[in-house]
Amino acid sequence: MKSYIIISGGRVDLYSLQEIMDRHLESSRVIAVDKGIETCNKIGIVPDVIVGDFDSASKVTVGVYRKMAKKMHSIQFVDLDTHKDFTDTHVAIMHAMEEGATDIYISGATGTRLDHTMANIGLLKECADKGVNAYIEDDHNVITMINSSAGISRLEGYDYISFIPYGGLSLIHI
């Protein structure tokens, strides 16, 4: 099992991120995506990989992590052009899958940019189609996609579960 925690540049609820970290940090690699590096800096996390065109991250924070990467040789930067066919988060997910990810936990994938939120939810389907378990977590939701039978466990703090078909015919047996 190879787990990744991706901290993207959307709205990050520090409580839900801390829950992800508590559950998965010891066995996971961490990828910061563009402005997600600000969250890493705020909570003192040194990511394994930093991906982005850095159009929304503080130049000072990016500079601090670049210096750290030169000294430590354990932080990988994936610099992207601002004109590209994929979002920064999409590139981070592709990077994790290329490294053999089996589970991906994403924080900061929802927020004020509806276009990015929708794109990120669509990325869950790409992960499911490739056999990778991927989850977007924020302070109100845990979102995933499945394309086969799955058992579901109750998560503490969540009272409801919704099933929404995405991209085709779905049958639900309860």
Mark where each language-model region is.
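Non-catalytic positions within long, well-ordered alpha-helices that form the structural scaffold/packing
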Residues: N41, M97-G100
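General beta-strand structural signal in soluble alpha/beta enzymes
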Residues: I7, I31-D34, G52, V78-D79, ...
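Short, acidic/small-residue loops that bind anionic groups at enzyme active sites
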Residues: E126-I143
